[in-house]
């Protein structure tokens, strides 16, 4: 790109010209970005910063927490609680909502986040990231957990920051998807891609094949057809990619196409899926749709789901539109 446009300038210009971003939302997104920079620096220190390894505690999901899970969660809370933009926050790592303390002014927004997605990859130096989503608090006094239970189509901003070879922030406010890369010397996120688009067709899928025996019939059918390649009903060869970090897998799909699958499986039949609707599926689904892709549970558009609880789980199929629609069709035919 000819001129270097910082995240701040990009958001200010969106606010002035497009009217997509109210001033308070712009300020909130800048604070989230600063928190991501701090998390990135902490992640980069690795063993030198004493941040690797397990914290020997479990989160609300019953998952063992890494030290960096807890650190990233605290960074996001401390950065956002005092600015006056938020009424409350909710995190994958916390049991309930975090209401902004009375000593700080309260704003009109609700922030949800997975502070460190893919944390099983921390100790082996593979890309991880932070996912976030912003909603408007419904009218009324005080803040309740119920206020967060809005379908994903009500989001006013969503994004993620991937900590890999570069630190990259990907953002939507409902007017396409933009990507920013952290210039460490300058200390700023710089716009490096606008109007990102996911190709409608692909020859690449991302799924954990070790779980194949636990999948439902439509998912087995789809993957089996992909694996048959040119000799099968699809008439083309497919490649498989799987990082085990949703941020990394979705970032690849946003930049070059593909389809991401994290389906329901028979090991926990009472749960509709593994990924969290509010902290992972909704923000990623909106980003993908804003880039021309699709996101489905196999039976329903993810963004139309009405959450029933804060830590609700869901099956996720997202990415290149024609592939996601094929998976949904297979579910309908089952």
UniProtKB/Swiss-Prot annotation:
Name of this protein: Fructose-1,6-bisphosphatase class 1 2
CDD domains assigned to the protein according to its UniProt record, in alphabetical order: FBPase
GO BP field: fructose 1,6-bisphosphate metabolic process; fructose 6-phosphate metabolic process; fructose metabolic process; gluconeogenesis; sucrose biosynthetic process
An annotated Gene Ontology molecular function: fructose 1,6-bisphosphate 1-phosphatase activity
Known cofactor(s): Mg(2+)
Cofactor: how bound: Binds 2 magnesium ions per subunit.
Residues binding substrate, per UniProt: 117-120, 208, 274
Reaction(s) catalysed by this chain's protein: beta-D-fructose 1,6-bisphosphate + H2O = beta-D-fructose 6-phosphate + phosphate
Gene3D superfamilies per record: 3.40.190.80, Fructose-1,6-Bisphosphatase, subunit A, domain 1 (3.30.540.10)
Compartments, record wording: Cytoplasm
Class of enzymatic activity (EC top level): hydrolase
PANTHER family: FRUCTOSE-1,6-BISPHOSPHATASE-RELATED, SEDOHEPTULOSE-1,7-BISPHOSPHATASE, CHLOROPLASTIC
Alphabetic keyword roster: Carbohydrate metabolism, Cytoplasm, Hydrolase, Magnesium, Metal-binding
Assembly, per entry: Homotetramer.
Source taxonomy: Bacteria, Pseudomonadati, Pseudomonadota, Betaproteobacteria, Burkholderiales
């Amino acid at each position: 790109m000819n001129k270097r446009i910082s995240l701040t300038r990009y958001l200010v210009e969106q606010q002035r010209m497009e009217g997509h971003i109210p001033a308070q939302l712009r300020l909130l997104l800048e604070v989230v970005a600063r928190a991501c920079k701090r998390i990135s620096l902490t992640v980069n220190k690795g063993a030198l910063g004493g941040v690797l390894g397990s914290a020997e505690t479990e989160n609300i999901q019953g998952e063992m927490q890494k030290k960096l899970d807890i650190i990233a969660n605290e960074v996001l809370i401390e950065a956002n609680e005092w600015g006056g933009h938020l009424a409350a926050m909710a995190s994958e790592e916390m049991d309930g909502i975090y209401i902004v303390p009375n000593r700080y002014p309260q704003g009109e927004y609700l922030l949800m986040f997975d502070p460190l997605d893919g944390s099983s990859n921390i100790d082996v130096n593979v890309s991880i990231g932070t996912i976030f989503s912003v909603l408007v608090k419904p009218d009324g006094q005080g803040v309740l957990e119920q206020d967060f239970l809005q379908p994903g189509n009500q989001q006013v901003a969503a994004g993620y920051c991937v900590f890999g070879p570069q630190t990259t922030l990907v953002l939507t406010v409902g007017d396409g998807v933009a990507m920013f890369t952290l210039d460490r010397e300058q200390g700023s996120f710089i716009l490096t891609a606008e109007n990102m688009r996911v190709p409608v067709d692909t020859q690449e899928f991302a799924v954990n094949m070790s779980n194949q025996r636990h999948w439902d019939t439509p998912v087995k059918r789809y993957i089996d057809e992909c694996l048959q390649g040119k000799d099968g009903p699809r008439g083309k060869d497919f490649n498989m990619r799987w990082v085990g970090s949703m941020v990394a897998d979705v970032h690849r799909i946003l930049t070059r196409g593909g389809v991401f699958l994290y389906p329901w499986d028979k090991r926990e039949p009472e749960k509709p899926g593994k990924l969290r609707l509010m902290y992972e599926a909704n923000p990623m689904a909106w980003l993908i749709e804003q880039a021309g892709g699709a996101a489905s549970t196999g039976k329903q558009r993810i963004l139309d789901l009405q959450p029933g609880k804060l830590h609700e789980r869901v099956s996720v199929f997202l990415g290149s539109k024609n592939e996601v629609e094929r998976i949904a069709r297979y579910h309908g035919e089952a």
